[in-house]
């Protein structure tokens, strides 16, 4: 497993549209996914220990952010042929197991991950209502272990600020995770 860190936020970068199939049978794009105050686009997968470590807390925070007008879409871009745990069928199982309240979509061609310059899972992009990037950072300090007792909810706090001001925090810490598994 290769661990990578994401680059920091390119403030104002405009979200690139996509049309990806969700585990709910719906095709999702930016217009359908975004909330009145913003959108989280996150690249996750099923097998990465960094994602597994945060998933229960991530799902909980996303539910709270929804009440603040922030919607979320999760994109799985890993090669499911070489990583069968990341198959579409297994995505459905994870979404059901954790009771996802957000769309979980498959990036079969990996074009969306490439257009966003996604590096790893998890990789978080926080956009304001105009779909301008305001946050590209970590979920929290967990890494792939237990959450520290003094855990700061970086993504939650950033998106709460974006919902209130449409601007992200100037100080951001990069996400760390497993490399995206590119097709050959």
Each language-model region and where it sits:
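Chalcogenol-based redox active-site neighborhoods
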Residues: 1-163, 168-172, 179-184
